[in-house]
Every structure is written in structure tokens, then in C-alpha cells.
Regions:
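Short Pro-Gly-centered beta-turn/loop motif in secreted/extracellular proteins
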Residues: 72-90
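Bacterial Sec-dependent N-terminal signal peptides
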Residues: 1-39
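Beta-strand-rich modules
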Residues: 195-219
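Short, ordered, surface-exposed loop/turn motifs in non-cytosolic proteins
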Residues: 37-59, 153-156
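Short amphipathic, basic-aromatic surface patches that mediate peripheral association
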Residues: 34-40, 143-151
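Structured interaction patches on ligand/partner-binding surfaces of diverse proteins
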Residues: 89-121
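Short, acidic Ser/Thr/Gly-rich low-complexity loop/linker segments typical of extracellular
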Residues: 55-70
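Short beta-strand elements
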Residues: 217-229
């Protein structure tokens, strides 16, 4: 009799585990981008996180992912109500805070595939970026627009040009870079940069201009371009 009881308990436990393991995975795809007045904000790959917290499931941890280097959001979620946040200290932009100093949240209702574009205020934007090859160098020009001018304003630490053999281009992913410190930039409307292209078997590189803000960990970038030479 005891053996039969143990067997029944074992079957109940196995059935319970199987039920937990057989939930369908999330099916709803939420896509979108982080923007400033409709313009994309370009970031470093796998660098700036965002989080979804779902209502009604106790104290579960967030669903955390990172923006792409084009500032794109792409997440598979269960249908339901979520809070979307960017953690404090992340991103080259201001994210709203609560009165307690934590990151404020955006309410998001997911019901099937949908799009979510999020407007934020960056410290700076790189405008009119142009990058080309000349004399064995990648040369770039751009304009920098200062967006935040109040008590939250921050200085430019440096502006640089970055090139790489692949489409992942940043301070951490490059084969060559060169830049100017903020103190050496005299005209935000006319910034010129140049970096020597190393000897390569391929006849092109990918390039972006990046701007480092003083006191902010994450850089903001120009759109990715392919430069042939």
C-alpha cells in the first residue's frame, strides 16, 4: 500500500512539472525605437538596457534586453500589461524619474504584435554626418546640436570617428578611431575628423561618428555608413 501511495505521489509530481514546462512561449512581438522628435537615436550595440515589468505576477524580475545600435526595440512578450523603464544612469539621454529618484515607467499593454516608439530627450544630437574615403583615410564632417540647455546640461567630452570591418561600430568595436576633445571643438556647426584606414583585404569599412558626454557612460552616434575605398 505504501508503495502504491509513493507511486501516485510521484505521478502527481511529474504531471505538475510537465504542466509547468509546457506553457507556450511568448508569441507577441513588440517592436519600435527610441526617438527624439521622430529622429532615431543611435547607440552602442548591446550597451543600453531597457526593462519590461509585468503586472500580476508577484515579484518576478524584469524582462531585460538592450537597444540595437540603431536604437531599435524588439521583444517577444506574453499578452498583458507591463511597465517599461530604462534604468537610472543608462543611455545618452534623460529618462524621467519619480519623486523618489527611481526611473519613471511607461505603461504598455501588449495584445498581439504591435509597435512602441518612445520619445526621449538626448543631451546632444549628431546632425548632417558625412563620412567618405580620401587618400587612405576615412574623413568625416558633422554638426552637433546641443539639446539640453538647463541645469541638466552637460559638456562634450570628445567627438570621434570609428571604423570597423563589420557593421558593429563603436568605441568598443573598431579597428581604428580618432577624435577631438570637447575643449578643442570651437564650432559645433563645423566638426571635421579623420582616421587612417588600416591595410585590409576588403575594400570597404563601416563607419560612425560618436559623441561622448561628460559624466555619461553611454555615447550617442551618427547612422552607420559603408565607406568604399
Amino acid at each position: 500500500m505504501k508503495l502504491l501511495s509513493y507511486f501516485i505521489l510521484l505521478m502527481v509530481a511529474v504531471a505538475s512539472c510537465s504542466k509547468k514546462d509546457n506553457y507556450d512561449p511568448p508569441q507577441s512581438k513588440l517592436t519600435g525605437a527610441i526617438l527624439y522628435k521622430g529622429d532615431s537615436i543611435y547607440l552602442e550595440y548591446n550597451r543600453v538596457p531597457y526593462q519590461f515589468y509585468q503586472y500580476g505576477f508577484g515579484k518576478l524580475g524584469p524582462v531585460e534586453q538592450t537597444f540595437t545600435q540603431s536604437g531599435v526595440i524588439s521583444s517577444l512578450l506574453f499578452n498583458g500589461n507591463y511597465k517599461f523603464i530604462v534604468p537610472n544612469g543608462q543611455g545618452p539621454f534623460l529618462w524621467p524619474k519619480t519623486s523618489g529618484g527611481g526611473p519613471d515607467s511607461l505603461d504598455v499593454t501588449v495584445n498581439g504584435n504591435q509597435q512602441l516608439n518612445i520619445e526621449v530627450t538626448p543631451y546632444y544630437m549628431i546632425r548632417n554626418a558625412n563620412i567618405s574615403a580620401s587618400g587612405g583615410n576615412a574623413v568625416a564632417t558633422c554638426k552637433v546640436e546641443k539639446i539640453i540647455n538647463d541645469a541638466n546640461a552637460k559638456d562634450i567630452e570628445f567627438v570621434g570617428i570609428y571604423i570597423n570591418k563589420t557593421e558593429f561600430v563603436s568605441g568598443a568595436n573598431n579597428i581604428a578611431n580618432a577624435g577631438k576633445s570637447g575643449a578643442d571643438i570651437t564650432d559645433l556647426n563645423n566638426i571635421s575628423l579623420s582616421v587612417a584606414i588600416p591595410s585590409l583585404t576588403q575594400k570597404y569599412v563601416f563607419a560612425r561618428i560618436g559623441l561622448k558626454i561628460a559624466g555619461v557612460e553611454d555615447m550617442i552616434f551618427s547612422p552607420l555608413v559603408q565607406v568604399s575605398f
